Each structure stands twice: as structure tokens, then as C-alpha cells.
Amino acid sequence: MGISRDSRHKRRLTGGRYPVHKKKRKYELGRPSSNTKLGSKLVRKVRCRGGNLKFRALRLDSGNFSWGSQNVTRKTRVMDVVYNASSNELVRTKTLVKNAIVTVDPTPFKLWFKTHYGLELGKSSEDPQASEKVAALVPRTLLDQFSSGRLLACISSRPGQCGRCDGYVLEGEELNFYRRRMDKKKRV
């Protein structure tokens, strides 16, 4: 039958049917959603209108994530999908979509921090001055995540359209908001 993005098949406000006076057109076509899963990388090219290409990611396992307050971006491994405002089904099936909250591997950021500041992240050092310096640079909530080995991040690209899974590390108010939402879900 084919997925169509027309409105001829819709009913009127009163509930009556519209008379269908023309067939489906090529420019109204829709495609099934990619539902990008967490796994080894698999990206397919899709030819679109005007000869343009879309990159349909079927499986992804890594992406470029930026740490906004430190102004650094690193390629890192996506470990898990933990929250999605759209649907719990997308969390259960580990589907990567825009604005999904995922956990990423903090190792690349730890290495950068070590080379840039000369300080260890996530480890409680014996030197109190070093730990004070780290505390001044990185908020407590982020330090806890670095020590646990799982950073919360948000996907800002569209994996089903561009074939990439890029995003940013959650910080500040946004991190607190999503933490509260996840705690609320756990309690229910």
C-alpha cells in the first residue's frame, strides 16, 4: 500500500469522509522509521527527493559528545539509553533518537582533563589541594558520574536522518531536571 503523507484520507471535522479524487503521488511518500538501535555501526544510504542522500543509521555504538562548560568535544561510546520523554518503549528497546538521554563512557573526557589540567577526574586523591582544584572546576553532580564511569548525555543529532549519534553532556539545571524525572519513574 505504501506510506503516504497526504490528508485526503482524513475525515472532516463532522466525521464525514472526503471524496478521494486523485491517487497517491510520489512527492507525498513516507518511509518507515529507522528505529536506530544500540549496536555495532550499520548505516544505509537512502536516495531522497532531488537526488539528495539521507544516511539511515540502523545501529550505532558511538558518537561525538561535547562537554559544554569545558568547551571540549570527544568521540565516545554510547553505553545505554536511560530516558526518553516520548515513550518508555524507546528506552526498553534501546532506540537512539534525538533528545534521548543516554549514558556515555567518560574515559575520553577524563584523559583530556588529565592532559589539560594535570588533574585526575573521578578518583579521590590523597592530595587535598588537587581535589579542591577539581571541585572548583567540575560540579559535584558531574564528579559523581565520572567516578561511577557513566556520564549522562543528550542526543542532539537525528540518527535516522544523518546517520550519526552526536550530543552533549548534561550539566546544571538540565541534569537536575532529568535526574528528578528518572527518580520519579523508578519510584512508580
UniProtKB/Swiss-Prot annotation:
GO terms for cellular component: ribonucleoprotein complex; ribosome. Residues 1-34 are annotated as: Disordered. InterPro entries: Ribosomal_eS8 (IPR001047), Ribosomal_eS8_CS (IPR018283), Ribosomal_protein_eS8_euk (IPR042563), Ribosomal_Se8/biogenesis_NSA2 (IPR022309). Keywords: Ribonucleoprotein, Ribosomal protein. GO terms for biological process: translation. It comes from the Eukaryota. The keyword Membrane does not apply. One of its GO terms (molecular function) is structural constituent of ribosome. Residues 7-26 have a biased composition (Basic residues). The keyword Lipid metabolism does not apply. PROSITE patterns: RIBOSOMAL_S8E. Belongs to the eukaryotic ribosomal protein eS8 family. This is Small ribosomal subunit protein eS8. It comes from Theileria parva (East coast fever infection agent). The gene is RPS8.
